[in-house]
């Protein structure tokens, strides 16, 4: 029996996530009142067939009933009902933009203030986030990328106990990824920004990757990084960790970080690990140092 509780911040993508879970064969329920959680779990565990995999959304829309969630989770544990929590997060800036684009008000907004609503919701969800087995930061994820992450966790992830590794390239000027487990600074590597023919390209272009990796320091660093990650992965798997987010940053997130992300991605893929790669800032830094 697979029982997934999807929660997180308003505007972070829970409605989209539950649709994808349905595509993956889960029986899905959106906005279940927390007071009904234990009874619903009992029905699911007594059922067979389509109820063998269940995903449901519980969030702040439950209003006053949301306060009952923790007691409901305790009752589920006492009854022997196993569950896991998926928490969807995003930056304040991204959430505000999404609310403005959809012209919706935040469910906890005071006098229509979206930032105040987000801050209040973060505080209310802080303890729940700590209980989550999986946390997905959707700040820079397109819809298809969210589906890919969910697929790796809840479809491919069921096929083995291997770690799911997410490699994120980024620019320090845009901030470190919120969900990073490991952060590597590659601003000491040769910068293609100063080469006129490469300035407007990114590490997704072979010319840029060749320029960066032709430097002995880049090769040496890459080899040492590969060795370190190869050493760490079995340790994380042994302690039961199922997601590892490796963030690689340069100045603008355009050239060097993207290049090293590609090299590490290929290295891990060749060794059979399940790896995702996301170049968070590669399209934000055109014409800036990267």
Curated annotation (Swiss-Prot):
Where do the annotations place ATP binding? 8-15
Q: What is this protein called?
A: Nucleotide-binding protein Clos_0574
Which residues are GTP-binding? Answer: 59-62
Family note = Belongs to the RapZ-like family.
Q: Which SUPFAM superfamilies match?
A: P-loop containing nucleoside triphosphate hydrolases
GTP-binding as a keyword of this entry, yes or no, is yes
Q: Pfam families annotated for this entry?
A: PapZ_C, RapZ-like_N
InterPro entries, sorted = P-loop_NTPase (IPR027417), RapZ-like (IPR005337), RapZ-like_N (IPR053930), RapZ_C (IPR053931)
Arranged from A to Z, the UniProt key words for this protein are:
ATP-binding, GTP-binding, Nucleotide-binding
Function field? Displays ATPase and GTPase activities.
Q: Tell me what organism the protein belongs to.
A: Alkaliphilus oremlandii (strain OhILAs) (Clostridium oremlandii (strain OhILAs))
What intrachain disulfides are recorded?
none
What are this entry's molecular-function GO terms?
ATP binding; GTP binding
């Amino acid at each position: 029996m697979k029982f997934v509780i999807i929660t997180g911040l308003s505007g972070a993508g829970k409605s989209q996530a539950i649709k994808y879970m349905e595509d993956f064969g889960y029986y899905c329920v959106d906005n279940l009142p927390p007071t009904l959680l234990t009874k619903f779990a009992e029905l699911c565990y007594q059922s067979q067939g389509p109820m063998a995999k269940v995903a449901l959304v519980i969030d702040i829309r439950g209003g006053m009933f949301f306060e009952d969630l923790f007691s409901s989770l305790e009752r589920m544990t006492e009854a022997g009902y196993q569950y896991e929590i998926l928490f969807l997060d995003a930056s304040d800036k991204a959430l505000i933009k999404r609310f403005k684009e959809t012209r919706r008000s935040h469910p906890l907004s005071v006098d229509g203030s979206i930032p105040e609503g987000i801050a209040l919701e973060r505080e209310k969800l802080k303890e729940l986030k700590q209980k989550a087995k999986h946390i997905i930061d959707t700040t820079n994820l397109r819809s298809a990328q969210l589906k890919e992450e969910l697929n790796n966790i809840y479809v491919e992830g069921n096929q083995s106990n291997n770690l799911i590794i997410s490699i994120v390239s980024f620019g320090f000027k845009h901030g470190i990824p919120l969900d990073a487990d490991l952060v590597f600074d590659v601003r000491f590597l040769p910068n293609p920004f100063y080469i006129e023919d490469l300035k407007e390209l990114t590490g997704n272009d072979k010319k840029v990757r060749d320029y960066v990796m032709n430097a002995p320091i880049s090769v040496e660093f890459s080899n040492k990084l590969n060795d370190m990650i190869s050493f760490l992965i079995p340790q994380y798997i042994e302690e039961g960790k199922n997601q590892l987010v490796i963030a690689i940053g340069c100045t603008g997130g355009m050239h060097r970080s993207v290049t090293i992300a590609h090299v590490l991605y290929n290295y891990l893929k060749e060794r059979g690990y399940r790896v995702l790669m996301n170049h968070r800032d590669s399209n934000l830094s055109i014409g800036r140092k990267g």
